[in-house]
């Protein structure tokens, strides 16, 4: 169990909740697996709904990644602040990326 908790903390260190992506960085992260399951953590970083920031759901990105690593599933997660809310708006980068993974 301590190894899993340590790995969870390592994975969450990649998520900068409040920060927009820097030059050359992606606001969305993903892991590819072979198991036909996709784990999604769309609110892993601060996101914006109707012009207002909404707090991140801490450690959801890391949990999605950890479970993906353990099961060889796919994972898609927010890793930097987003000007959109992928669970609220239809045509946003997160959903476009999700569509490419499941296609």
Residue ranges and their predicted role:
Residues 1-103:
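N-terminal catalytic or cofactor-binding beta/alpha core of small enzyme domains
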């Amino acid at each position: 169990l301590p190894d899993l908790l340590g790995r969870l903390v390592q994975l969450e260190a990649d998520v900068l909740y409040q920060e927009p992506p820097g030059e050359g960085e992606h606001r969305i992260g993903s892991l590819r697996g072979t198991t036909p399951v996709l784990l999604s953590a769309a609110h892993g970083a601060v996101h914006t709904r109707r012009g207002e920031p909404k707090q991140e759901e801490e450690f959801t990105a890391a949990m999605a990644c950890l479970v993906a690593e353990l099961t060889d599933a796919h994972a898609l997660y927010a890793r930097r602040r987003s000007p959109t809310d992928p669970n609220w708006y239809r045509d946003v980068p997160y959903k476009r990326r999700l569509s490419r993974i499941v296609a």
